[in-house]
């Protein structure tokens, strides 16, 4: 997204925001997810309403509104995550950044430093508006965590203020820019994955029925009200569906981009000069390295969507959700797993520290939407439509945001 232009240089100079989120999610993910789930449930009710009459809307509009609130719960806490002005600002900032990046991408490289500031004027204005909301949280007396069970304790803004207290160059403006940067990354990560998996589910009624059966079994018939962290972990069919959707719908073809800091010579004799850029074609790897279904006489083709590809004895996850947690090999098949053949969330030290939070949020969104609402694609030219095609712009691949659905509350 050309962060050096769209977020100012704070995203490139230091990674304080990344280390704060990594520490927060590593130590307190179990304290954070209940509040996130609650926020998603409340946001769905607010955005979708309770009418039992069909209404037409963009599924992308629903998801981005819900994700903006759940992300804000983590970043700035309950005091701001239900503030409509702040949430609308976050959504506009995310969409404006994507739009600005697309314009900058179209420029020849030598023109970017000259013209990019013109394209990013609105982003600077939005950061100033965000400062009015976030600055009191950075400067307040409760910047550091105090009460162990306070839901507002586990927010990125408070941890960031604590980490950067006394660092002269870290002004409030820079810290606000970091929070807004995290906001954009979180919104797009969860939104794109949620849209993709929902498109895959809505296009396959049999998959939807199987997921609803699993939710009923795991929750004991209590629906999403009976789901805590442990129950969400036991939704192995849904987890498999998410991983399969991400496998076939990567957000970028090229990943793990880096620049050689010195001359490199590989064991094959290949030489890479200092300053050269290196990257991996992650999309091709994901689409060519599904799990081997060795004991199946007729394994599903690797280039086709198979929702429960990872819910088989061969993959190490029991098809019996009541015993799946006892399988020691299960983790390698989870949506959060990282490996040389599953690069959705990066790999090694470049792996995404927020992947557990992201997958939990995706599950909560899917469960809440499927249980509480009837959702179906609008017919296209009077005919039922299948899975919407993705939209590709250069290296970026996104689910079609223009797809319309019909929604009504379940009675």
From Swiss-Prot:
Family (UniProt): Belongs to the cytochrome P450 family.
Pathway annotation: Mycotoxin biosynthesis
EC number: 1.-.-.-
Record's keyword annotation contains Transmembrane: yes
Keywords of the record: Glycoprotein, Heme, Iron, Membrane, Metal-binding, Monooxygenase, Oxidoreductase, Transmembrane, Transmembrane helix, Virulence
Disulfide bonds: none
Species this chain originates from: Leptosphaeria maculans (Blackleg fungus)
GO cellular component: membrane
Sugar-modified residues: 12, 149, 342
Protein's recorded name: Cytochrome P450 monooxygenase sirE
Binding site for heme: 352
Transmembrane segments: 181-203
Membrane topology term: Single-pass membrane protein
Any one GO BP annotation for this protein: secondary metabolic process
Gene that encodes it: sirE
Predominant cellular place of this UniProt entry's protein: membrane
A Pfam family reported for this protein in Swiss-Prot or TrEMBL: p450
Enzyme class: oxidoreductase
Molecular-function annotations in GO: heme binding; iron ion binding; monooxygenase activity; oxidoreductase activity, acting on paired donors, with incorporation or reduction of molecular oxygen
């Amino acid at each position: 997204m050309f962060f050096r232009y769209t977020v100012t240089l704070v995203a490139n100079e230091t990674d304080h925001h990344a280390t704060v989120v990594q520490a927060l999610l590593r130590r307190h993910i179990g304290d954070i997810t209940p509040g996130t789930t609650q926020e998603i449930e409340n946001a769905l009710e607010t955005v979708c309403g309770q009418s039992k009459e069909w209404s037409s809307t963009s599924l992308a509009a629903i998801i981005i509104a819900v994700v903006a609130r759940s992300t804000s719960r983590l970043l700035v806490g309950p005091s701001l995550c239900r503030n409509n002005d702040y949430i609308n600002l976050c959504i506009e900032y995310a969409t404006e950044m994507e739009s600005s990046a697309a314009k900058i991408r179209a420029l020849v490289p030598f023109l970017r430093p000259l013209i990019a500031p013109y394209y990013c004027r609105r982003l600077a204005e939005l950061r100033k508006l965000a400062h009015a909301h976030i600055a009191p949280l950075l400067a307040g007396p409760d910047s550091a965590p105090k009460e162990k069970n306070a839901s507002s304790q586990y927010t990125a803004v408070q941890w960031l203020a604590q980490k950067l207290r006394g660092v002269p160059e870290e002004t409030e403006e820079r810290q606000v820019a970091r929070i807004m940067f995290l906001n954009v990354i979180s919104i797009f990560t969860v939104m794109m994955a949620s849209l993709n998996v929902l498109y895959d589910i809505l296009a396959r009624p049999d998959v939807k029925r199987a997921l609803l059966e699993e939710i009923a079994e795991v929750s004991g018939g209590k629906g999403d009200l009976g789901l805590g962290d442990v129950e969400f972990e036991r939704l192995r069919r849904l987890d498999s569906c998410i991983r399969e959707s991400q496998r076939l719908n990567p957000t970028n073809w090229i990943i793990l981009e880096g620049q050689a800091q010195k001359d490199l010579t590989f064991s094959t004799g290949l030489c890479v000069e200092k300053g050269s850029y290196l990257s991996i074609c992650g999309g091709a790897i994901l689409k060519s390295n599904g799990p081997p279904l060795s004991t199946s006489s007729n394994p599903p083709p690797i280039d086709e969507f198979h929702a429960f590809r990872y819910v088989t004895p061969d993959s190490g996850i029991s098809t019996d959700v009541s015993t799946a947690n006892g399988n020691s090999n299960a983790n390698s098949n989870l949506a959060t797993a990282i490996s040389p053949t599953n690069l959705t969330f990066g790999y090694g030290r470049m792996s995404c520290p927020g992947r557990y939070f992201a997958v939990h949020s995706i599950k909560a969104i899917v469960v809440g939407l499927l249980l509480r609402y009837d959702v179906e694609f609008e017919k296209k030219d009077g005919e039922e439509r299948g899975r919407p095609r993705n939209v590709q712009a250069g290296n970026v691949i996104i689910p079609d945001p223009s797809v319309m659905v019909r929604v009504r509350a379940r009675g």
